[in-house]
């Protein structure tokens, strides 16, 4: 309300995208100091295109029973040094979609749709309308959770 009334702009930095979703109109996702995806909050959550964004979104905890058994992306590989970042795409050492080109050529930040920018050699759609992943994820681990059993009236 204050932002709209006073025409304010602010920069909010967080690793918690579940909070960022409700505070920000536009989200920029950064990895190792580089912008890898920039779009409206709605677009980031409905149609993420960078593998790091997809991984971040998969890590958001949920209490929705329909999402409790949803696969989570477990990033593997070496975490690069920000002082001596790798050649090519900075995310390639942990990316589940990386190829040889990613190791050599830094991807440019390109506008794939109006207002949606991505720095990835593979900007094809990553998630369908139901939130299912549209690519093979060999580095995935299925996590399951169970709803807590509530005490019955007799146990209260």
List each language-model region with its residue ranges.
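P-loop NTP-binding/switch modules centered on Walker-like glycine-rich loops
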Residues: 1-70
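Charged, flexible cofactor/metal-binding loops and thiol motifs
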Residues: 41-150
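Long, low-complexity, intrinsically disordered segments
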Residues: 150-156
């Amino acid at each position: 309300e204050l932002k709209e009334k006073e025409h304010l702009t602010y920069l909010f930095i967080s690793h918690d995208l579940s909070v960022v979703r409700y505070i920000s109109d536009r989200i920029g996702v950064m990895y190792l100091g580089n912008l890898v995806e920039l779009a409206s909050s709605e677009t980031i959550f409905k149609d993420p295109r960078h593998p790091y964004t997809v991984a971040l979104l998969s890590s958001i905890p949920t209490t929705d029973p329909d999402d409790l058994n949803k696969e989570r992306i477990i990033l593997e590989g070496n975490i690069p040094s920000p002082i001596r970042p790798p050649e090519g795409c900075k995310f390639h050492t942990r990316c589940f979609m990386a190829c040889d080109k990613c190791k050599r050529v830094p991807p440019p930040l390109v506008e794939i749709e109006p207002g949606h920018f991505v720095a990835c050699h593979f900007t094809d759609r990553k998630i369908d309308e139901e939130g299912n992943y549209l690519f093979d994820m060999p580095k995935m681990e299925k996590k399951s959770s169970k709803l807590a059993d509530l005490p019955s009236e007799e146990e209260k």
